[in-house]
Amino acid sequence: MKSLPHITLCVSPLSWGYMTTYTFFNHAGGVGKTSATRDFGYELASRGHRVLLVDFDPQGNLTSFLGADKWGLNQDATLLAALLEDDPNAVQSRLPATVEVHGLSLYPATIDLAIAEAQLLAKIGRERRLSNILNHLPQAYDYVLIDSPPSLGTLTVNALVAADSVITPVATRFKAVDGLPGLTRMVNELQWVKPSLGFAAFLPTMYDQRNRHDSDVLEMIREQLAPLAPVLPPVRYRAADHNDASMSGQPVQVYKPGSEAARDMAQVVTAFLELQGQPA
């Protein structure tokens, strides 16, 4: 694995009662990022927290994974419309209505979000457009979780700059770990735009404890990433549970309560809240 560039560690204890925004980010696809965002958010909501999920990926998988019909949404009020609105005071009127599902609020993605990459390039303050949206939310939340695109474009920059800090799912595969220097370098460079940006935690995903390769890579993740941010307990991959939950449009905890996948995410969120000094 290539050496990781230096990056400032910004993991501060959170004040109870304030909205905190985390972006789930990994520029590599296939690491379980969207499922982790959904299930992490549901676990928080099931413990009484007010949670807003933001599907900021033009593919709209988070929207689909929660059972929302992304093709039947109102196309006049969308995340794209809010992003491109030049009057900060008019942003709220351009926002879509949240989809309320499984105790969560969701800002869904529509396919037109894909054109934002090009259109935002000509906009003043393009890196902070999503931040401005979150500053004008019509209601209060404890947590906002952003599912970012698996890319390094303008939308991803917006998702990162809007965050208080970053949660990075990392598959326990050498190929996934080998790409992390580029990811950490990007967050490091964005500190020019947002000096406080840093990693909140790394979340090992796709873990199969029966596989020696996975165990070796998990140990590598713990050794090499722990200096940057805490490494959370791994989420074991159970294809049937995770894939079927997504196909049914449900968090895995709803689709199969008490399953290994559901228990893993409960342990992850408990560990995360304890790290932040919050009641689990």
Tell me what each language-model feature is.
Residues 1-280:
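P-loop NTP-binding core
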